[in-house]
Amino acid sequence: MEIEKIVLKDGWIRFIPTFLNEDFANQLFEDLQQTIQWQQGEIVLFGKKHATPRLEAFCADDQKSYGYSGQRLITHEFTKELNEIRQKLTLEIGTSFNSVLLNLYRTGNDSNGWHADNEPELGKNPIIASLSLGATRRFDLKHNTTKEQLSFHLNHGSILIMGGELQHHWKHQIAKTKKVNEPRINLTFRNIQ
């Protein structure tokens, strides 16, 4: 398994382009589209409510709760498929996770603007493992102070892991694009304190 580790100023990233084999990734992608209870939430930006520009779901152990930008997500139990992925992650990267935020980007018009995963319930220096299924999308990072930028093309079956102080010093996004018309599912595994 090819692993690219990138040490950044104020954090690190690991990128594994073939974390899942294609057959398993294809089946998981189809299963999640059909079995997950997707919802479109509302977030508060600059005092105004907006529909999230993607669909979401949240699964966690022990009814752990998670929210951001003025919304709390409904907590569901881990499915069999999500548990399999979680166990594989634990074996491969040596970190265990108690929750996963799922995002369904229906087309290139769905997005996730500049943000950091720095909510208090994630702890001081969270490790976030982001698994991609479906359409390839560009993932951008930007340093808060130096404005240095870095981009990855997150392909079907790949995983990007963020750690160290990254969430304190960098923001990331999935920008809108007219080049993509197919859906993408992103699973962001994390630990809720």
Residue ranges with predicted function:
Residues 1-193:
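Non-heme Fe(II) oxygenase metal-center motifs and adjacent flexible, charged/small-residue loops
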